[in-house]
């Protein structure tokens, strides 16, 4: 009974929010008149694609940016194939642990840059973070796995 009461109160609250104050949680920039010739600066993808959007914007060439965007997402799908370490866990692999946290920091930086306007300091930071993203995944992770395989005598 108390679960049904909680669900009904939640539904009531959401209905009141939607029916009486639909703009309460919206973005006020959505009400500015649009220029059909360019994309407004407040338009950006959802938060989980902001890292890929930052990589897209970091390359001035349109085709190169799109290829980098697609490859940044495909790399995440192909990461299990790039994992060459004999030991699956990172518990006894301190180099891989450090590299993982550097990659997490780089992804957070790219996500932050993807939400920023295209201005001077953000462009350079986005380009450096994009290069670091691909360098960590394609170069440093396989090298680190090989070194740790040799250290662990696998």
UniProtKB/Swiss-Prot annotation:
Recorded GO CC terms: mitochondrial inner membrane
Keyword Transit peptide: no
Cofactors (names): heme
Lineage: superkingdom: Eukaryota
Annotated cofactor note: Binds 2 heme groups non-covalently.
Predominant localisation class: mitochondrion
Example GO BP: mitochondrial electron transport, ubiquinol to cytochrome c
Entry keywords, A to Z: Electron transport, Heme, Iron, Membrane, Metal-binding, Mitochondrion, Mitochondrion inner membrane, Respiratory chain, Transmembrane, Transmembrane helix, Transport, Ubiquinone
A Pfam short name: Cytochrom_B_C
Transmembrane spans: 1-21, 63-83, 95-115, 122-142
UniProt GO molecular function: metal ion binding; ubiquinol-cytochrome-c reductase activity
Membrane topology of the entry: Multi-pass membrane protein
Xref: InterPro entries: Cyt_b/b6_C, Cyt_b/b6_C_sf, Cytb/b6-like_sf, Cytochrome_b_C_euk/bac
Locations listed in the record: Mitochondrion inner membrane
Subunit details: The cytochrome bc1 complex contains 11 subunits: 3 respiratory subunits (MT-CYB, CYC1 and UQCRFS1), 2 core proteins (UQCRC1 and UQCRC2) and 6 low-molecular weight proteins (UQCRH/QCR6, UQCRB/QCR7, UQCRQ/QCR8, UQCR10/QCR9, UQCR11/QCR10 and a cleavage product of UQCRFS1). This cytochrome bc1 complex then forms a dimer.
Its job: Component of the ubiquinol-cytochrome c reductase complex (complex III or cytochrome b-c1 complex) that is part of the mitochondrial respiratory chain. The b-c1 complex mediates electron transfer from ubiquinol to cytochrome c. Contributes to the generation of a proton gradient across the mitochondrial membrane that is then used for ATP synthesis.
Other observations noted: Heme 1 (or BL or b562) is low-potential and absorbs at about 562 nm, and heme 2 (or BH or b566) is high-potential and absorbs at about 566 nm.
Family: Belongs to the cytochrome b family.
Protein name: Cytochrome b
Species: Cervus nippon hortulorum
Lineage: Eukaryota, Metazoa, Chordata, Craniata, Vertebrata
